[in-house]
Amino acid sequence: MNLNFTSPVHPVPAPRPTSFFIEDILLHKPKPLREVPPEHFAGSLASRVPLLDYGYPLMPAPALLAPHPHPALHKPEHHHHHPYFLTTSGVPVPALFPHHAHAELPGKHCRRRKARTVFSDSQLSGLEKRFEIQRYLSTPERVELATALSLSETQVKTWFQNRRMKHKKQLRKSQDDPIHEENREQSSPEPELPEPAAAEPRKGPPGPFLLQDPEDEVDILEEGDILAAPHRL
């Protein structure tokens, strides 16, 4: 038995010729896109991709083991600065002010230095001459000198402080300089030592028969003279 099953043939609609008339263009309206509610999108995303506790999607093992083309974007510190992140519900939420959220607070402002005072030649000459005469000035003297040189009292006080420090450094450097020490030793004369006095000849002890005084001379008589002496008297 020959059974032939033939499927019904549906007529294929002929394609509508394309027209560039304004009426055809206006009549051809695109179908509106169907809006998907966020709850449906979140549920479908959560059902397809499991999420971790802190909101990042858990990728399959092969994807984790394969080298990522952009490893720098998957560093732990990059997730804090990424403008979009996934919450636990799976909905991407844009971060507000991503570049300013983790900006460091500016440090303390550096104290600006005051502008350095530039003295004229006449002012420097007057200050140097006064410094040679007097190293320390009282308040009335500073006011008087500042008025004479068209300066402020603070400028004169600061200049004298700096000049005293410079003078002390110069003295310390000159004392530590070996050439200066050698010149100072050569310039200072050696003290003259007193000449030793000439030694007087030492007199020996007088002998037993040495007469010191002519009045002490005694006539030595012989034995015959001693016997004949009474007859002379």
UniProtKB/Swiss-Prot annotation:
| An example Gene Ontology molecular-function term | DNA-binding transcription factor activity, RNA polymerase II-specific
Instruction: Please state where this protein is localized.
Output: Nucleus
One GO cellular component assignment for this chain's record is: nucleus
GO biological-process terms attached to the record: brain development; cell differentiation; regulation of transcription by RNA polymerase II; stem cell population maintenance
* Primary localisation category: nucleus
The record's region (Disordered) falls at 164-218
Q: What residue ranges does this record give for the DNA-binding region?
A: 110-170
Q: Which SMART domains match?
A: HOX
Q: Of which family is this protein a member? A: Belongs to the distal-less homeobox family.
Known function: DNA binding protein that function as transcriptional activator. May play a role in the determination and function of cell types in the brain.
What this protein is called in its record is Brain-specific homeobox protein homolog
Q: Which organism is it from?
A: Gallus gallus (Chicken)
